[in-house]
Every structure is written in structure tokens, then in C-alpha cells.
């Protein structure tokens, strides 16, 4: 009985040692409403950290700020759990945050809609913060190239002085990365 238990423990230990992450690091580009640089690293066999840095464009359609264009520079780190459906195709799910700086909030739309000088207090530079979930697929080619397609619904807030504008911040992103 003790030999069987010892054998099973050794076997489980060897199997856990042979389990490896999909790859260690990758770097490339991301395209969606945010265009920029994407870096991904595996922290363990199935847990990955993705850092996306780039420029995002958001066009509003709410009653508070009708048709205002917001541009921002953002950092979007996501912590993901990846599981394999086969050796090359991997599913992922996770969550992340968004931190950024925004500017040029579409002043021409306020002029066009007949806005007053008081409306301009909402325009200008500010900060952006938000949270998102992420779900998608990643395909690893035989060459050192990984392509990821994901959906990122989230909640974002643009902040300038005492004004906060809340919005549904969603993306469908395509990332192409070179595997290091």
C-alpha cells in the first residue's frame, strides 16, 4: 500500500513538472478602438498577464455629452486564465483595469449642436479609469507568432476637474505578437 502511494505521488509530481505554459513572453501590436503595443507573459502554466499600451478613440452618444469625441493614451493590464482546446488553439478569460490620460474632447460637435460657452468647461484634458473583463481565443502558429482575438466589455470614467463622465467601454481586439 505504501509503495502504491509513493508511486502515485512520484507520478503526479513528474506530471506537474512536465506541464508547461504555452510560451513565456510575446510582444507585438493590438488593434481595436485602441491601437498600440501589446506584451504578454505567463506567470504560471495557465495564468498570463497582458499589458496593452496605446491610443484610444471613443465617440459618445449620451444625453449629457452628445457627439463628443474623446482621445486617450491608456495602459490596459489584464490578468487571464488560459486553457487549451488543442495544442495550438487556446481559450482565455480574465479581467483588467484601464488607466489613461485623455484630451481634445471634440469641441466642434458642441459648436454644431448650438452649445453655449458654458458647455466648454467639459472640454479639455483629464484622466481616464476603468475596469473590464476579457474573453477570447489565441492561436499559436508553428512559427513564433501568436494571434489573439478577444472581446472586452467594461466600464470607464473620464475625469476632468469635478466632472465625471461614465460610459460603457467595450472593445473587440485583435493582437498579433511575436513569441520570444
Give the residues covered by each predicted segment.
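Sec-dependent N-terminal signal peptides
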Residues: 4-14
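Sec/Tat signal peptide C-region and signal peptidase I cleavage site
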Residues: 15-19
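Transmembrane beta-strand segments that form the barrel wall of outer-membrane beta-barrel proteins
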Residues: 20-35, 47-57, 153-155, 159
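Short N-terminal binding/cap micro-motifs at the start of the first secondary-structure element
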Residues: 36-40
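Gram-negative (and chloroplast) outer-membrane scaffold detector with strong preference
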Residues: 41-149, 155, 175-180
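Membrane-interface anchoring segments and C-terminal beta-barrel signals
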Residues: 146, 166-167, 171
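Outer-membrane beta-barrel porins/channels
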Residues: 159-165, 173, 177-179
Amino acid at each position: 500500500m505504501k509503495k502504491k502511494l509513493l508511486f502515485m505521488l512520484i507520478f503526479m509530481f513528474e506530471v506537474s513538472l512536465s506541464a508547461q505554459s504555452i510560451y513565456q513572453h510575446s510582444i507585438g501590436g493590438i488593434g481595436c478602438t485602441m491601437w498600440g503595443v501589446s506584451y504578454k507573459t505567463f506567470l504560471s502554466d495557465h495564468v498570463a498577464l497582458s499589458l496593452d499600451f496605446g491610443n484610444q478613440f471613443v465617440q459618445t452618444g449620451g444625453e449629457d455629452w452628445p457627439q463628443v469625441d474623446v482621445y486617450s493614451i491608456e495602459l490596459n493590464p489584464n490578468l487571464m486564465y488560459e486553457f487549451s482546446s488543442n495544442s495550438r488553439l487556446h481559450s482565455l478569460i480574465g479581467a483588467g483595469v484601464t488607466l489613461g490620460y485623455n484630451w481634445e474632447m471634440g469641441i466642434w460637435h458642441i459648436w454644431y449642436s448650438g452649445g453655449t460657452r458654458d458647455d466648454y468647461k467639459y472640454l479639455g484634458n483629464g484622466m481616464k479609469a476603468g475596469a473590464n473583463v476579457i474573453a477570447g481565443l489565441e492561436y499559436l502558429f508553428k512559427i513564433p507568432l501568436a494571434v489573439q482575438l478577444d472581446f472586452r466589455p467594461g466600464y470607464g470614467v473620464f475625469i476632468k476637474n469635478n466632472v465625471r463622465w461614465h460610459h460603457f467601454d467595450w472593445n473587440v481586439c485583435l493582437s498579433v505578437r511575436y513569441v520570444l
